[in-house]
């Protein structure tokens, strides 16, 4: 698994709704050097509502990880579920300062969502 596996070439997509599904496991955490949890098993989905000038993105995740119990010091399975939405618009330069709005340069044709999915899972 590589971060480019989470790149969406949106320039060729028609106006309308598009779904992108990703099966996640521990190799996904390895992309980010994240070692706090193991045993990641889950599915992430990004639904894109594309118009001529704006994309509405809805991310969802459902899965589980293995976590260490603070009391028993044993591994247990923790179920996870999370979702968030973000809007993508075009502007002069890249800007992700607003957590609900992403601005891409007019020249961009690819949406890189690996970091978005990582945050979706880790913040579950």
Briefly describe each language-model feature range.
Residues 1-124:
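Acidic and generally charged, gly/proline-rich low-complexity regions
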């Amino acid at each position: 698994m590589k971060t480019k596996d989470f790149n969406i070439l949106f320039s060729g997509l028609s106006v309308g709704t598009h779904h992108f599904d990703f099966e996640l496991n521990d190799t996904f955490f390895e992309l980010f050097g994240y070692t706090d949890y193991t045993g990641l098993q889950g599915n992430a989905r990004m639904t894109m509502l594309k118009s001529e000038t704006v994309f509405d993105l809805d991310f969802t995740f459902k899965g589980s990880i293995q976590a260490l119990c603070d009391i028993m010091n044993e591994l247990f399975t923790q179920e996870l579920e999370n979702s968030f939405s973000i809007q993508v618009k075009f502007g002069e330069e890249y800007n992700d300062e607003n957590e609900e709005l992403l601005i891409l340069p007019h020249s961009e044709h690819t949406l890189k969502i690996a970091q978005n999915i990582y945050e979706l899972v880790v913040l579950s």
